[in-house]
Amino acid sequence: MYQLNQNQTVNTPQKYRPRLALTVGDPGGIGAEVILKALADLEIGHNYDLTVVSNKNLLQETYKQLSSMENLLPLADPNLLKIIDVTVDRETARQINLGTGNAASGAASFAYMDYAIAQTLAGNFDGIVTGPIAKSAWKAAGYNYPGQTELLAQKSGVERFGMLFVARSPYTGWTLRALLATTHIPLRQVADTLTPQLLTQKLDLLVECLEKDFGITSGRIAIAGLNPHSGEQGQLGTEELDWLIPWLESERQKRPHFQLDGPIPPDTMWVKPGQAWYGNAIVQHPADAYLALYHDQGLIPVKLMAFDRAVNTSIGLPFVRTSPDHGTAFDIAGQGIADATSMKEAISLAAELVCQRLHLEK
């Protein structure tokens, strides 16, 4: 049995304790482990009103298994947590195995999400922090969503939404914010999917988020080009000349409070953020936010800088949703070595965004 670190201090509780639902994600992955590790942190456990949406037996078995290991970080005791016990039928439950995803684990993780979304839309939670799911397991269970973000958008009835990745540097305190213009689509479809209308929609969402969630009413946004060297005057691709540069000129006229830089060659756009992450953010003058045009263009640099602490934030929803920026990690499930830093960051950021939206003191 592992005890909480008695040297930890607890801040005075906030005037308002954000009500957050924590979904455990795929029961075959590390979701239960990182949640129990995160909730053992007194800062998190005492400052926020947290409810875990999961099969209770999964949390108890995870706690029992991991507690028998030596040199393990503290774990929250499930018997002391607020848990909403969401179960699947016995036959499905018997098919769930630690370390792998299948139709059964997909059905379970979908049930956790479905419940949390319904209760949040009903006003019983202020936001959701989602554990990692396996898209292949969802598909095997008959749920054909590209990811959790798309399910959240559909259930919320919104058509405008985006994936914003947020990370605070432990070295300088600077905050990285990177929005993806396109998300879970094949690379060969990116150029045809990108349009001026789509980028205007994403830029609208980004500006609204900066103003509403981060209190940034003026600043600088960097926009990546699509092609190497941003096309190099049409020699390496013509999208920049054909429509991306004219689109940016039009957007600059409509948004005088924000400096829109771009299209910046994708490889060099991330130099200043990298320097600001590890060095002096004031000297480097990084942008307040970055708009990447496709998934890996944004997430490779984000994960290089902040793999253990980046947070996926769904913007455009009627409530706050965050998620740790890592997957199910089936290969290390049950070994006690999963890093809970990103889950802690996801919980803390969700609480901050809830308070910001409610105009309450943190």
From Swiss-Prot:
Ligand binding (a divalent metal cation): 184, 229, 295
Enzyme class: oxidoreductase
Any one GO MF annotation of this record: NAD binding
Pathway: Cofactor biosynthesis; pyridoxine 5'-phosphate biosynthesis; pyridoxine 5'-phosphate from D-erythrose 4-phosphate: step 4/5
Residues engaged in binding substrate: 149, 303, 312, 321
Protein location: Cytoplasm
InterPro entries referenced in this protein's UniProt entry, alphabetically: PdxA, PdxA_fam
One Pfam family recorded for the sequence: PdxA
Free-text comment on the cofactor: Binds 1 divalent metal cation per subunit.
Alphabetically ordered keywords of this record: Cytoplasm, Metal-binding, NAD, NADP, Oxidoreductase, Pyridoxine biosynthesis
Keyword Signal: no
Signal sequence, start to end: none
EC code: 1.1.1.262
GO biological process: pyridoxal phosphate biosynthetic process; pyridoxine biosynthetic process
Cofactor requirement: a divalent metal cation
Reactions this protein catalyses: 4-(phosphooxy)-L-threonine + NAD(+) = 3-amino-2-oxopropyl phosphate + CO2 + NADH
Gene Ontology CC annotations of this record: cytoplasm
SUPFAM superfamilies named in the record: Isocitrate/Isopropylmalate dehydrogenase-like
Oxidoreductase among keywords: yes
Oligomeric and partner information: Homodimer.
Similarity comment text for this entry: Belongs to the PdxA family.
Protein role: Catalyzes the NAD(P)-dependent oxidation of 4-(phosphooxy)-L-threonine (HTP) into 2-amino-3-oxo-4-(phosphooxy)butyric acid which spontaneously decarboxylates to form 3-amino-2-oxopropyl phosphate (AHAP).
Additional facts recorded: The active site is located at the dimer interface.
Full protein name: 4-hydroxythreonine-4-phosphate dehydrogenase
Organism for this UniProt entry: Nostoc sp. (strain PCC 7120 / SAG 25.82 / UTEX 2576)
